[in-house]
Amino acid sequence: MKFRFPVVIIDEDFRSENSSGLGIRVLAKAIEVEGFEVLGVTSYGDLTSFAQQQSRASAFILSIDDEEIVEEKPEAIEQLRTFVNEIRYRNEEIPIFLHGETRTSRHIPNDVLRELHGFIHMNEDTPEFVARLIIREAKAYLDSLSPPFFKALTHYAADGSYSLHCPGHSGGVAFLKSPVGQMFHQFFGENMLRADVCNAVDELGQLLDHTGPVAASERNAARIYNCDHLYFVTNGTSTSNKIVWNSTVAPGDIVVVDRNCHKSVLHSIIMTGAIPVFLMPTRNHFGIIGPIPKAEFEWENIKKKIEANPFATDKNAKPRVLTITQSTYDGVLYNVEEIKEMLDGKIDTLHFDEAWLPHATFHDFYGDYHAIGADRPRCKKSMIFSTQSTHKLLAGLSQASQILVQDADSIQLDRDVFNEAYLMHTSTSPQYSIIASCDVAAAMMEAPGGTVLVEESIMEALDFRRAMRKVDEEWGADWWFKVWGPNDLSEEGIEEREAWMLKANERWHGFGNLAEGFNMLDPIKATIITPGLDVDGDFSDEFGIPAAIVTRYLAEHGVIVEKTGLYSFFIMFTIGITKGRWNTMVAALQQFKDDYDKNQPLWKVLPEFAAKFPRYERTGLKDLCAQIHGIYKHNDVARLTTEMYLSNMVPAMKPTDAFAKMAHREIDRVLIDELEGRITAVLLTPYPPGIPLLIPGEQFNAIIVNYLKFAREFNERFPGFETDVHGLVKQVMDGKAMYFVDCVAD
């Protein structure tokens, strides 16, 4: 397949009628005759912005005239040096040629010269020869870009082989036989459909057996991610977590789990028949889940939890796995080296669910606050696993995930045993585009480019925070939005890691007395706080702006956020973020403020929402905010939601046994008013925040029941802003919505 990567020529005379302009255009024409596109420009412009275009080029030709290489006029040399440095900051391999008249390499500073692939003298060799020289280097560069699996897949898709195997669309041909299929084909395109193949294509290797180009790509990714073993997973980190667990946990094993874990970890507990003991995180009244205090990780405290668990028959059994959410949804990180020091050898496997942290290993900013990195010491006895969603913050397609493994000094991964669990959870018909995106996402993070991508994400996140503070200073005398995070930020540049440490009893985070150096906040995760609630859980008597209304407004104005809480919403600065995106966010928030202050009617500012829910048509934006704020305040919802997550969850059955009751239909569908004391057979997960509240086998307490009653009343009063609780069963009886939970039968 031919990719579009033009040769970029930068020459101030490119469009001039002088001899220099004529010469460079003749060279450009010779390159085009050889089949390469040429992009000619007359100046560097914004050096940084232009250098970023290296990702779209196959080579650069930089022109410099004799009169510019003189000591009296160093500007041209300095501009050349700056541009070359900007290119090399991002890309060490792309060919750079210097095009001049009579001066030679001895006239060019050595720090510039050593970065060049060649020096082209005008009017010496023929343009045709020089063009072939440039194209040879450009082709070699382009050939080096594709990682193993992606290269094999593009070759296969371009090869023109007839497929007499599945999938049934046969390279997209089936879609051409139907009008709606034609639409599908035109939307997704020839390449994606030709590359959608099955494991019958031996030349692409096998994901399930880790052979051929697939294996080569996994080895390449392991090198890039600084781990001993790496496995691509095509159906998300939910599956990666289950693979890790099924490879090491059996029925009756004791496991130590972050209570703030993803539901896939709880599913793993149910599937394996494990006996969980939970480490309890902190939580502030904004609804932000904080870190697990360091004391919870102390071995003596873990032993006490095991001894207190009624289902742990062998109180001295060694836990098989520790699973920690790293980072939390809101960006709180743990110092992994301290956890390793505390628990090495005491727990067989230390598993870090890093679905939201695949970028950390590529920048020194994150230090020891991620699981596996370059020059990080091994555990002596415990294996380290990291499960990462490359689709969340890097460039993987949706569901692209990977498992990273670091061997211990005394224990190495048994790849054959591990692969049995991998086979259990991996489709025999994996999506090859996802495999390719895992491959490419890893290759993109190769230094120096990956480091630059992460640094740019951090810088954009910091610039967003600074912009929001600037608006607050200039325009927010009455009210404005806050960005959750440390108060003292510099005006320019990237912050030191120390600035993002969560220090004991600092009011901004609200997590209390935290251990020094144990936690930090990832700056690329930004939680915007709306007015009306403080970190202590006290509601404003004057006014409040619930976040659900703000994010509904943003959505109708083309800005979609990641997560919405009571008075906060969450956005991420991934490697795909742009200045245009976050500046549009700032502008949209300013427009919201203006519409709120004017109390604009919803039919005007939220027309789609008002059309769907006509009861709100004539309601003012400020009035609606006041109504929902009043309900939240009256029910003290911030404290209620905090207390229910921190309340005592009593295990009455093993999770596996309770779930089995549901599978056998040995359940009662219980009204929420009658839930107190009943044992749930299902996961109960309120959104926000999307963290499971109860797991099968635990009993409902009064606080949780009170929250469910509130959710029922709120949903009836404010349709369109419903509190979603997974695990609740809604049934309409006699025109009235009734809510139930499936519980273990009495």
What are the functions of these language-model segments?
Residues V41-Y44, T48-Q53, N85, P109, ...:
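Conserved PLP-enzyme active-site core in the AAT-like
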Residues E190-T239, V741:
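Conserved N-terminal alpha-helix of the aminotransferase class I/II PLP-enzyme fold
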Residues E32, D46, A51-A59, V70-R81, ...:
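Non-catalytic terminal extensions of PLP-dependent enzymes
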Residues L98-H99:
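Hydrophobic/aromatic residues positioned on beta-strands within the core alpha/beta folds
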Residues R56-A59, R114-I120, E128, D228, ...:
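Conserved acidic residues
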Residues M1-V7, S55, C227-D228, G252, ...:
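A short, charged/proline- and glycine-enriched loop
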Residues F3-I31, L39-G40, F60, I269:
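Conserved acidic segment of CheY-like receiver
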Residues D13-L22, S63-A76, T102-S105, T328-G331:
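Short acidic, S/G/P-rich loop/turn micro-motifs used as interaction or catalytic elements
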